[in-house]
Amino acid sequence: MKLSNCNTRTPRAARGFTLIELMVVISVVAILTTIAVSAYRTYVRRTTRTEARMALLAIQVAQEKFFLQNNQYAQSLATAIAAPPAGLGIQLTAGGQTLGGHYTVSFTAATANTYTVQAVAIGTQTADTAACRTFRIDDQGVRFPLDSSGCWR
């Protein structure tokens, strides 16, 4: 009669994963997720800059049209939001925010012959690069920040 050995061990490969192996895998996945989320947020902030650029460039074009019709530039945000011919017809909220809600647009140093309009980041967009939180453009087409910072691209 043959006795079976109850202490026979199963080969290691058939037993599954150890707790340490699972923890290493979870740690690696957590690190990769952190890197991916950070890169995604940076990408979203860079993409949202388009909102400010579009608003400022739309105001610039509308200002030139307004100047041709009225022989002066619009000097206030209320005029910018008002429908033509009395205003520029720019799509902003009553408080001067872009429709996406990431920038506040305002006129600075506006006269009948000159203007400077700026868009300042608000909310989550304030986490953007310091150089790209405020955009400005004037009646001469001068843009701030300078294009070397990459904000207008």
Label each residue range with its predicted role:
Residues 19-22, 63, 119:
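Conserved hydrophobic beta-strand within the GNAT/NAT acetyltransferase core sheet
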Residues 12-43:
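N-terminal single-pass transmembrane signal-anchor helix
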